[in-house]
């Protein structure tokens, strides 16, 4: 069964993950994560104006969301995750971003390899 993936939207939800969560990072992304007590993973995406104009920022958010959606079946459920984009992310393609997110997730307790 496919797990549901919802988005973090409220400022209060983001602040809770920033202040209470743990962090892993690489050159494209800083990832904050913490348990949420629910049966689903929730993801939020923060892309500042330093990354580019709105078209670029929205594209980055779409790529991050799709990458996380594809990897969600390999994750333990019940976590809030916030991805914060770093400067060079606008130059990265989809496959690079997906690999980058997967490497970050493997450093956390969220990731569990499942057989297909």
Curated annotation (Swiss-Prot):
It is an enzyme of class 3 (hydrolase). One of its GO terms (molecular function) is ribonuclease P activity. It catalyses: Endonucleolytic cleavage of RNA, removing 5'-extranucleotides from tRNA precursor. The keyword Metal-binding does not apply. Its EC number is 3.1.26.5. Coiled coil: none annotated. One of its GO terms (biological process) is tRNA 5'-leader removal. InterPro entries: Ribosomal_Su5_D2-typ_SF (IPR020568), Ribsml_uS5_D2-typ_fold_subgr (IPR014721), RNase_P (IPR000100). One of its GO terms (cellular component) is ribonuclease P complex. Consists of a catalytic RNA component (M1 or rnpB) and a protein subunit. Belongs to the RnpA family. RNaseP catalyzes the removal of the 5'-leader sequence from pre-tRNA to produce the mature 5'-terminus. It can also cleave other RNA substrates such as 4.5S RNA. The protein component plays an auxiliary but essential role in vivo by binding to the 5'-leader sequence and broadening the substrate specificity of the ribozyme. This is Ribonuclease P protein component.
């Amino acid at each position: 069964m496919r797990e549901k993936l919802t988005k973090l939207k409220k400022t209060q939800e983001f602040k809770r993950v920033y202040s209470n969560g743990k962090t892993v990072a690489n050159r494209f992304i800083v990832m904050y994560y913490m348990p949420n007590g629910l049966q689903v993973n929730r993801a939020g995406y923060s892309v500042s104006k330093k990354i580019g104009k709105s078209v670029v920022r929205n594209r980055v958010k779409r790529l991050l969301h799709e990458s996380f959606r594809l990897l969600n079946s390999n994750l333990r459920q019940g976590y809030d995750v916030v991805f914060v984009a770093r400067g060079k992310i606008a130059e990265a393609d989809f496959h690079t971003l997906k690999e980058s997110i997967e490497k970050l997730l493997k450093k956390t307790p969220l990731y569990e390899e499942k057989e297909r």
